C-alpha cells in the first residue's frame, strides 16, 4: 500500500483536488479524493506527504527509440534500423531494447513513466512498436502492450536509404506502391487463413493485428503530401493509423481533421537538418489541437532527449497550444493514441499507480520532478530537494 497525502492533484479527467490524497495497492489506484475524506494513514509505512506540490499522472512518450538507439555506443548500441531490405514487418522492438540504456534513468528523473518504443524510419515497413514502462531490468516485465503498432515510413528517409543501393524504393511512388502491395498480400493471406486455404506465414501473421483493427499503423510523415499519402492508403484498406511527426500538419489541418487520425507532433526541439522538415515548428501542435485533432507530443528520442518531453510541451504552449492541452499531450492523449488508456494516462481508480510529483508546472524549465512512481513503487526521488517530500 502507498498513500500520497496533501497533494495538488491533477487527474486529467477534469476532476482535480486542491488538497487531495491517492492510495495505491498492488500496483493499482484504489482511492482518490479530498484530504477531508482520506482514511487513517498514521500507522502505514509507505506515506508520501506531497506538501501541496503537483501530483499528476506519469508522463508518457508517444514515439521514441530509447534502449534501441543508445547513447555513446556507436554501431554496437544502434539497433534502430534494419536497413538492408525495405519491408520488415516481422521485426519486434522488444527484441532490441536495452533497459540499461541511460535514457531510462533520464526518463524517470523527468517524471516519464511509460513510452512507445519502436524501429526507425529507414524502411517502408519497419516493424512492431511496443508500449513499455520506463523502469526495470528485464524488458519482458516492462511490457504494457506488444505489439502496440506497426511502423511504416514515407518520404525522405526510405528514399535516401535505398536509392543509394540501387534498389526500390527510390521515389515516393515506389514507397506507396510497395506498401500497398504488402497490405494487399497481407489481406489476401488473412482471407486464406480464415478459410484454412494456406499454411501459416510468419511475415503475414504480423499484419493480422493491424488488419483486425487491434493496433494502428504508425506512420512516419513530415511533408504534407506524405501525410496525405499515408491517409489515402490507410483509408483504402480501412486501417487505423497515427500520424507521427506531422511536421507540415498545420498546412493541411482540414484534411487531417476529416481523416479522424491523431497526430504525434515532434521532435520540434530538433534542428531542421533535412529538407522535409523545413516547416517544422512548435505552432503545429496548437493549430491541430484547435482544429479538434487529438495531439500528443514526442521527443523522438534520441533526436531530442527524452527528459525534455515536458519542456517540448511547454514550448508548444508558448506557441499557441492551450495550457491544459499541453499536459494532455503528454499524459492522457498519448495513452489514448497508443491504445493503453485503460491502464495509464490519468489518475483514476483501477488504473496503474503511475504518478509523478513536481514542485511546479512540469512544462516550465525550472520545475523539478520530486518523485516518480510506477505501479505504486517509488522509482525515483530527487534527493537534492527531498525535504519537500516526506517519506514516512
How should each PLM-predicted stretch be described?
Residues 71-72, 78-84, 88-89, 216, ...:
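His/Asp/Glu-enriched, well-ordered alpha-helical/loop segment
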Residues 93, 190-281, 296, 336-338, ...:
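Active-site core of metal-dependent hydrolases
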Residues 9-56:
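Histidine-rich, glycine-flanked metal-binding segment
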Residues 70-97, 138, 151-155, 160-161, ...:
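Active-site gating loops and adjacent loop-to-helix segments of metal-dependent hydrolytic enzymes
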Residues 131-232, 236, 270, 302:
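Metal-coordinating catalytic core of metallo-dependent amide/deamination hydrolases
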Residues 74-125, 169-196:
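Alpha-helical scaffold segments that flank or form the walls of functional sites
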Residues 5-11, 17, 336, 348-392:
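C-terminal cap of metal-dependent C-N hydrolases
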